[in-house]
Amino acid sequence: MGSMSIWHWIVVLAVVLLLFGRGKISDLMGDVAKGIKSFKKGMAEDDDAPAKPAEPPRAVPHQATPAPESEKKAV
């Protein structure tokens, strides 16, 4: 009872075909195909672009901080 039989699917398919018609479904599938092609083209272009080499880390010179005035007087 909970599963859909083949007759349920046939009725659903018939209703979809009646609502959308052959032309709209064809246009929809064409748009999906164009989207997939565009996505694949974008991914291929992304792979072709040379990766910018990472800049090597630079060492920051350490500067000694001057001692506070109170420590200078004690010495």
Curated annotation (Swiss-Prot):
It is found in: Cell inner membrane. One of its GO terms (biological process) is protein transport by the Tat complex. GO terms for molecular function: protein transmembrane transporter activity. Keywords: Cell inner membrane, Cell membrane, Membrane, Protein transport, Translocation, Transmembrane, Transmembrane helix, Transport. The chain crosses the membrane at residues 1-21. Part of the twin-arginine translocation (Tat) system that transports large folded proteins containing a characteristic twin-arginine motif in their signal peptide across membranes. TatA could form the protein-conducting channel of the Tat system. PANTHER family: SEC-INDEPENDENT PROTEIN TRANSLOCASE PROTEIN TATA (PTHR42982:SF1). This is Sec-independent protein translocase protein TatA.
